[in-house]
Amino acid sequence: MASLIDIKQRITSTRKTSQITKAMQMVSAAKLGRAESNARSYEPYVSKIKDVVTHVASTGNSSDHPMLVSRPVHRTGYIVLTSDTGLAGSYNSSVIKEVFQEINKKHTSSDEYAIITVGRSARDFFKARQMNVVLEVQGITDHPIFAEIKDIASNTVQMFEDGVYDEVFIYYNHHINSISSELRKEQLLPLTEFHEKGKETDVDLTTYEFEPSEQEILEVLLPQYVESLIFGALLDAKAAEHAARMTAMRSATDNASDLISDLSLQYNRARQAAITQEITEIVGGAAALE
């Protein structure tokens, strides 16, 4: 049985840990509020640019744009959004596991895929296994701005246009609320949804006149749209990260409180046993003197 001193030391150290996790929980809660606001405020922009792309791409003259049309897939690109730090439950592991399993299932060679990582967790995991990481970025702030992701977003589009890969998927955690999120896999390129809408739409867009031409507009608009999708996913993932960390720290704080209660009970029992032992020894000694 542990001594009273050992138990007391464990209670003290657990209480200090509880104070740290409680503070981290409160910090994450504050960050979550702002992250949710950032994600919500960005949605109207993405929605509006999508409407514009839909109108332009639905014309017959622009349906053959290379970013809108599927082509034979020889190589697949994977964008993986994770965090730089842990202490966020399964936030990182769920995304990494999904991508890892997908690659192992679909590809037999590293020449058949390319990984783009955002966050140290994904980079370290895939590089430790000598997997094909072609682009990486770390140090994304808690409340990112587009400049932080612009290079990797524009390079993603450029590599597709250059034929480095023939399709691109993005994997991230979608924020639902403070206690739940869901893993999302979305196709970024090619933008076949607009090509299909162009075939299905009942709206006659031939009366629209474009200046400059539809192709010239799409040359600028489509890369911006894909970049906006990547940034929007990053904002969403950041909200999910803060929520996951807040939940993990709350759970850690609750577990620490339970452990302190158990240790306190154990301490009191050990102390009572020690006192009982001392009384027994005193009584026994007194009886021996009689």
Curated annotation (Swiss-Prot):
Coiled coil: none annotated. Its main location: membrane. It is found in: Cell membrane. Pfam families: ATP-synt. InterPro entries: ATP_synth_F1_ATPase_gsu, ATP_synth_F1_gsu, ATP_synth_F1_gsu_CS. It is a peripheral membrane protein. One of its GO terms (biological process) is proton motive force-driven plasma membrane ATP synthesis. One of its GO terms (molecular function) is proton-transporting ATP synthase activity, rotational mechanism. Keywords: ATP synthesis, Cell membrane, CF(1), Hydrogen ion transport, Ion transport, Membrane, Transport. Belongs to the ATPase gamma chain family. Produces ATP from ADP in the presence of a proton gradient across the membrane. The gamma chain is believed to be important in regulating ATPase activity and the flow of protons through the CF(0) complex. F-type ATPases have 2 components, CF(1) - the catalytic core - and CF(0) - the membrane proton channel. CF(1) has five subunits: alpha(3), beta(3), gamma(1), delta(1), epsilon(1). CF(0) has three main subunits: a, b and c. This is ATP synthase gamma chain. The gene is atpG.
